Amino acid sequence: MMSSVTSEIIHTDVSGQRVRPPLTYCNGELGLKNSEDAAYFCLEKFKSFNEVPDFQYIYLTLSLHVPPPTRKYLLKFHKRLLNVCRLCGETGDLVGGRVLVSGVSQKTADIVVSAKSNGEVLYDWSNFFKSTVRVRCRYTIAKLYNNKAAMREIAKQKNWQTTYPNLEAYRKLNDAAKNSKHTPIVSIQTPPPPAPTPNRPDVPASKNVVITQRYQKPVEKIEDSRLETTRISVIPLLSVLLLVIIIILL
């Protein structure tokens, strides 16, 4: 079964019109052995868009080639579709309770997958044979980057692609937004770099020796003084006991 994951960037400009900027592709292969590393490599690109207005959501599309379905295969597909779609959206469920799955064959068909409160998923399998099914789910980029379960699910796909927009096109939109009354919506906050630690002069080894000796000597003296006090207190007690015994014997 051939499968792939792609993404579509939905962006609106300052006037509210929907914009489709030129896209460049970040393939899952990338010469990296681990596909999960490749997925994180692609999402690193998104972190650089924190100054871009309205850059909030990414739409990941899972494409599955569907052979003539048998009951066994439908159960596998059902489970796999659930694993992908339950990671979608801000609450981790299907976006708005529904996911549109479009099957492309000789005739274009829409298969509606609706999720009930008990987790049951219903399919409309009309015109589903020998088609390619595409499931589109909406992710919040910041939450997707922090969601390791979603990243693992994306990395399981054999041939997936993550698209990200041309930075130059977005910078122009960002400059236009700064000159208007539009408030940029920032979904990814990059943490500030850690403050540099002040350089401390190295302390010579001889000074360390002196300091340790200073703190060790009083401790030894305290222990010795305690021993001496115990010895002094034991001697008169023994002498008194001896005197009492002698008097009793006499």
From Swiss-Prot:
Residues 190-201 have a biased composition (Pro residues). It comes from the Viruses. The keyword Zinc does not apply. It is found in: Membrane. It is a single-pass membrane protein. Residues 182-205 are annotated as: Disordered. Its main location: membrane. The chain crosses the membrane at residues 230-250. Keywords: Membrane, Transmembrane, Transmembrane helix. One of its GO terms (cellular component) is membrane. Belongs to the ascovirus HvAV ORF18 family. This is Uncharacterized protein ORF12. It comes from Spodoptera frugiperda ascovirus 1a.
